[in-house]
């Protein structure tokens, strides 16, 4: 389970409490809901409920795709992952304009791609460099 490994490596035990933002590959609405659950941000079968509750809105418990995600911001195939990392960078450096979160510490960027017979997925925990 990719998310579990990534969280363990980053020292994250409760992603909803410890992450400040998430950028995920929402190429289709159902993909976003499934990823809430796969990334352990929602319990199995409850991603849709969490989405409707506002849990993942800008002012919710864990803001997800506050730049609009792939469906609203755009899906530059081959560069979507870079765009997600860039949005995280903007947030961590206070340069996200109207989308700016108060004081983000850690974020998660998720991307996927490929074909039905060959697929790849990547998860990165990112944050503002300290020191």
Label the model's feature ranges:
Residues 1-131:
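Claisen-condensing/thiolase-fold acyl-transfer catalytic domains that form or cleave C-C bonds
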């Amino acid at each position: 389970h990719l998310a579990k490994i990534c969280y363990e490596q980053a020292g994250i035990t409760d992603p909803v409490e410890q992450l400040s933002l998430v950028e995920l590959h929402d190429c289709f609405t159902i993909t976003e809901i499934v990823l809430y659950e796969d990334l352990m941000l929602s319990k199995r079968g409850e991603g849709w409920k969490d989405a409707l509750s506002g849990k993942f809105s800008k002012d919710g418990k864990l803001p997800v795709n506050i730049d609009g995600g792939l469906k609203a911001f755009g899906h530059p195939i081959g560069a979507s992952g870079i765009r997600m990392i860039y949005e995280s960078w903007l947030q961590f450096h206070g340069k996200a304009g109207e989308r700016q979160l108060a004081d983000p510490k850690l974020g998660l960027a998720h991307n996927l791609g490929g074909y039905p017979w060959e697929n790849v997925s990547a998860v990165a925990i990112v944050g503002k460099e300290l020191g």
